[in-house]
């Protein structure tokens, strides 16, 4: 009996000791876990990205159009800025980099980035650079500098750089981290090739733990001839100036375009659009005011591929081909060699007895012309007569749009698929288009819809 009581007492004591040990082990594990979490939190790694040098862009003769170079830049490590030293760094930056305005300096210190690029210190000597890094919140890193060697020349071809928008983030997700992306021209079209991979600067707390070097972008070689491009640009500027001198009007000529193709390869060797801009102004950022001025002027529009304008009399080539292939000639003619007498206007009657008169650009007319000479002299009357015959013979049938079909077979109405962004499709007007516009854009069409006069305008490229 005594032995049993003694055994129970011993068992109870052992049980209490075991529970105490178990409780201590639990506390120890919990404390270790919390300590580990604190340690992990303190050791959270953050990454800052610096863009690698973008690929360079060359013309057909290996002239460098756009270059990239690495130059030392001063950065501010904001994790080392606190209430005690902020004013010291603000004053230092204001005193040593007087070109930076107060607004810019405020933006630097209010940034949410780990590192903020302050200024290019390429022209600062080595000793002064060393004095900069003696201040613990300053860091020096090589940063790529983009230079557009010909300023405004070929700006619509090479394009410019800027901060990525939400749309850019979807199109070029890899360009978000270095926070720079091609916004137009070749810079945008070949963004994935030109950008390369950024350098990664990995932070542990407020110190740099590791640097993973990036990969430079790929070079781009174009068909452009920069010498011809320069001549074409200067010629267009002179032409605009001459037009404004000759024609006194409030609406000054400001826009123009030139495209030169190599007839052997169809490569673009010159493409000029005015007004233009200097891509160098975007390298370090452009003010909203200056950006708005360029935008209002139409400088960002690449007119050769985005301007939707009537082609003019060059469209008569389409009508020429149609006449040759379909044997459609002015009323009374049955071959290309037969002639009409162009007196400077075309007159024809409507069913109600009224008359319509179309006047040629040459008031006294072109005289006797056949298909070939009418194209050579750009005789409107001859081609109006062809359009009138098409309308009278085929109005309301599928053949009514035979001219448009020939135009589309030659590429009118579609994009050229040139390797530049934002190209607009052309427009070949016909009855179907007018009917669609009547629903979606009624302000663009008359209530009576597509008429023979529209076909007559189209055949001379208007």
Where are these regions (language model features)?
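Periplasmic/cell-envelope proteins involved in peptidoglycan metabolism and beta-lactam response
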Residues: 1-286, 399-409
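Beta-lactam-recognizing serine transpeptidase/beta-lactamase-like catalytic domain environment
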Residues: 64-66, 102, 106, 207-211, ...
